[in-house]
Amino acid sequence: MDPRPAEPGAPDPLPAGPALWTGRRAELAALRAAAVRPAQGRCQVLVIAGRPGSGRTSLAVRFVRSLAADYPDGVLFARLSAPDGGRVPPGQAARRLLEQLGAVPGAALLPLGAEGEDEPACVALREALAGKRVLLLLDDVRDSGQLSPLLGDEPGCLVVTTTAGPLTGIEDIDPVILGGLDQPAAAELLSGLVGGTRISCDPVGAAELAEACAARPAALRLMAGWLRDSPKAAVTDAARELAAPAPAPPGAAGASDAADAKRGGGKADGRRSKSGPTAETKAAPDEPVAGPVPVPDTDPLSGAFTLLYRSLPAAQARMLRMLTLAPAQLADLRTASALVGCPAPEAAAALQKLAERELLDQELPAHDGTLRYRVPGRLYARLVQLRESADRPAEVQLARARLLERLVRLVDSARMLLDPSAGPVTDPLPGPLRLRTAAQASGWLVGERDLLLGAVADAIGQADLDGSAGRLVTALLRALPLTGTAAPADLYRLHEMVLKVAERGGAPRRAAAALLNLGDLQSAVGHWEQAADRYRAALDHARDSADEPACARALEGVAECSRALGDPVRAADWYGRALALRQSLGDHAAEARLLARTAEAHTAQRRFEEADREYRAAQAVLRRLGDERGRAALAAALERLREQVEGERERLTSE
């Protein structure tokens, strides 16, 4: 049954999925039957479970597309783990789902540090789904702690999830568990990928190959790629090669060792790896373990990959290994050419060849039409092991540095297109890599935002390319606000990264600036207690660096938070400290502002004489500055103060 097309003109958030689809009729029927069951007081949850390579994501996408027309309020998609096993926090997923839903960014989009159901973005998502019929696809859920905070009480919504293992703690779910394809579906898949004549002329060989692959779609696709690369080989040869114990690619450890290395901090001996994302990332004992789901060496998927990898040209094999360094393992000709250091046309051709060999999954194109590809999670762990054995650490570090510098140039070029007043691009990229219009620049920045943030986080996490990472952070902080859709949470993450690098590098002035920006973002959405903590920390760093303007700004920030929290006594004290510092710096505009703020704090304490004195002092400063508009505003404030004092006198007289 063909899925129904999306509404004309509606953005499609779902992955592209494979062009050729066969089988899974029983599983689709089970999902459809489960979808129409009455919801028990909350949104219906369907779970598709299967081992890596079972085709769970493609089944989920096909099923969701077939139901999309029944959910008029939209289809939402979020991937809750990366191919490297990185676990996406539920708050981050909720923010992206809110954006797809069209919710206006606000306080809920700024992290509070809370995890789980109380995370503001999760609360906002559940509220936004109330009264709507929305279909959500949550792909590659690692644990119920990711899923539970996203589930609302709206029975009109349907949530479809995919996972490699059981999701304990979620009630009333009956997972659809995927095994291999049935024999006709496996033969149809091979026929469509290899060529009908070649398969139909050897049905016995096709059956043997399907059995050797355990009829798993991913293994069948890899062996189809091997057969296309070996036009003289018979189908029975493919089955024989796969069944025979083949040596692993040079230096490759088992995939389970790769997963252990990822979880334990790099190489399997527990030492820190300098070769990329396998650098030390030990999880706390009570935290969910992040890492790719291991594929055993005895799995047909491992054997099929080994056969196909050994047949690759050296340049394509190197690119495939280096793509494990791409943010979220998603690459296009811009990032791939930077990672391997080749011209863009060569990178584009290599990416296409790897996708044709079923070694990369093709994703939806970027906003400007650039083709994009993803390293499948089922292959990631083994590719990391191949990279660590075949590529020197210095080569890997150089590839990562080239990628960061390429991203800096792309972000800067996007900023120049969005803000022509910033001047022309001083170092334009080669033609195939360029963004050509402001619309392309804005779409690229918004569409690649998570990948850009991930690239910074990867670099900062490994602590060896802080200079390049810092330049990318600066470029993003300048460019993202120009898109008009820069979420506070994204800016918050960037300033947190600046803070981490500054503290690690012993740069208190930069740390103070980052903390001030974090405090400003928190206070802008009313998170006053968290903002006050940031301002106090900024004050400590500013004092360490003798940065008096930053000290004054931090003091004023703490005062504003105290005022908003209903503590005028502390507010007046903090305002007074900031005022003294601004006066010593000769900042008269800030002096007038702080005098007025101090007067307001005195008024809240019913200390009317002190308030009147501060207002008049502020007026005198503004008179010297020639600020007539400011003086008029203060005159109005003084008039309100006099009316309040008069009202108090009348009240006391009447009593």
What spans do the regions from the language model cover?
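C-terminal boundary/linker of central alpha/beta nucleotide-binding cores
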Residues: V61, T161, P203-A206, Y309-R406, ...
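Loop-to-helix "switch" segment enriched in basic
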Residues: G169, W226-A317, V425-T426
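Short, well-ordered secondary-structure microsegments
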Residues: M319-A326, L410, P424, P428-V501
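Residue register of alpha-helical TPR repeats
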Residues: R374, R471, R510-L515, R553, ...
